[in-house]
From Swiss-Prot:
This protein's UniProt keywords: ATP-binding, Cell inner membrane, Cell membrane, Ion transport, Membrane, Nucleotide-binding, Potassium, Potassium transport, Transmembrane, Transmembrane helix, Transport
Presence of the UniProt keyword Aminoacyl-tRNA synthetase in the record: no
The protein, known as: Potassium-transporting ATPase KdpC subunit
Function: Part of the high-affinity ATP-driven potassium transport (or Kdp) system, which catalyzes the hydrolysis of ATP coupled with the electrogenic transport of potassium into the cytoplasm. This subunit acts as a catalytic chaperone that increases the ATP-binding affinity of the ATP-hydrolyzing subunit KdpB by the formation of a transient KdpB/KdpC/ATP ternary complex.
Pfam families named among the record's database cross-references: KdpC (PF02669)
Transmembrane annotation, as ranges: 13-33
Length: 188
């Protein structure tokens, strides 16, 4: 085979793989995802009554009002395009001081110690969930701020607690955005 034939073969194979792997494969699977899982394929967006996007059920948001449950802290300030952890070791003084400060602020606002998930950042920096225990320690503050009976708020937390995936994987969790939207929907 001459060098020119080898170059021709290489160019043809490159074109075939580029079309197959670079165009056909992504288009087929994107199309499949749009048909089979349209909500997830489009980011699991959450919309309000006016059909405006107010968040995603997969990305945490910062809630600071006493009327809302607060999620996990984010090392990236909840910026989805910058997903990632702080990469600080557990013995890092900066991390230790931040956790202590967050715990003190939480205790001052809630009158109780936080659960570990409320003062540690997730690996992605975007976790939309907290533990049921993390929600429970915020229940008194939220019910007081909204003038709701604590039992009513606890019931809502229980209602929005998701179980383990397939009953065995992961831990029970509460989606903070979904819970806060449900709180906003309560009529007094």
């Amino acid at each position: 085979m001459s060098p020119l034939q080898e170059i021709g073969t290489a160019v043809r194979m490159t074109a075939i793989f580029w079309i197959g792997c670079g165009l056909a494969y992504p288009l087929i699977f994107t199309g499949f995802a749009q048909v089979a899982f349209p909500d997830q394929a489009n980011g699991s967006l959450v919309r309000n009554a006016q059909n405006q996007v107010i968040g995603s059920s997969l990305i945490g948001q910062k809630f600071t009002s006493e009327r809302y449950f607060h999620g996990r802290p984010s090392s990236i300030d909840y910026k989805a395009e910058a997903s990632g952890a702080s990469q600080l070791a557990p013995t890092n003084k900066v991390l230790i001081e931040r956790v202590k400060a967050d715990a003190a602020a939480f205790e001052a606002q809630n009158g109780t110690k936080p659960t570990i998930d409320l003062v540690t950042t997730p690996g992605s920096g975007l976790d939309p969930h907290i533990t049921p225990a993390g929600a429970a320690v915020q229940t008194a503050r939220v019910s007081r701020a909204r003038n709701l009976a604590p039992e009513q708020v606890r019931k809502l937390v229980s209602q929005y607690t998701e179980g383990r995936f397939l009953g065995i994987f992961g831990e029970p969790r509460v989606n903070v955005l979904a819970l806060n939207l449900a709180l906003d929907g309560i009529r007094r």
